[in-house]
């Protein structure tokens, strides 16, 4: 059973460098009032980048999950004032893999984990790649990994990151449609 609700109040209980924790009070249409906490996040982008032969990914440590070299799509936060989602995707592609793309297509926008955060992730397909040296961010420790597009199935078997799985499954769906 779904229920409409209104937010009565909300305040920040923790302010961090990357996220904030918000506590809010809500009244549902049946009159019940509930208190909820959630992680406030500025949103993110991820880029499925390929040149027709190679698929461009990154490996980086993710301390929160204990991963020393998590295989991921190039991605980043929407944390630059005034920057559009597409501008953020272009910036992240340059920063993380040193590429620019002639062609951009929005694939999906989804809620990353609606039970505890308001983060939405926007995934783009980037093709027509060319070199564009970006600038490395000192604490990211990124390793660029180019994989054969023909090995997409094997790559999917290695991936445990949600945004990367979503993006690569959407890519595989597109490639399968083209092949049919």
Name what the model sees in each region.
Residues 15, 20, 43, 117-120, ...:
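A generic structural signal for well-ordered coil/turn residues at beta-strand boundaries
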Residues 21-23, 57, 123-125, 144-146:
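Conserved hydrophobic/aromatic beta-strand scaffold that supports enzyme active sites
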Residues 2, 45-91, 108, 133, ...:
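Conserved Nudix-box catalytic region and its N-terminal flanking loop in Nudix hydrolases
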Residues 2-5, 32, 69, 116-117, ...:
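Nudix hydrolase/Nudix homology domain
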Residues 28, 49-51, 59, 125-128:
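Residue-level signal for short segments within beta-strands and strand-turn junctions
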Residues 42, 62, 72, 94-131:
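Active-site segment of metal-dependent pyrophosphate-handling enzymes
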Residues 5, 9-46, 51:
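Acidic, metal-coordinating catalytic segment for phosphate/diphosphate chemistry
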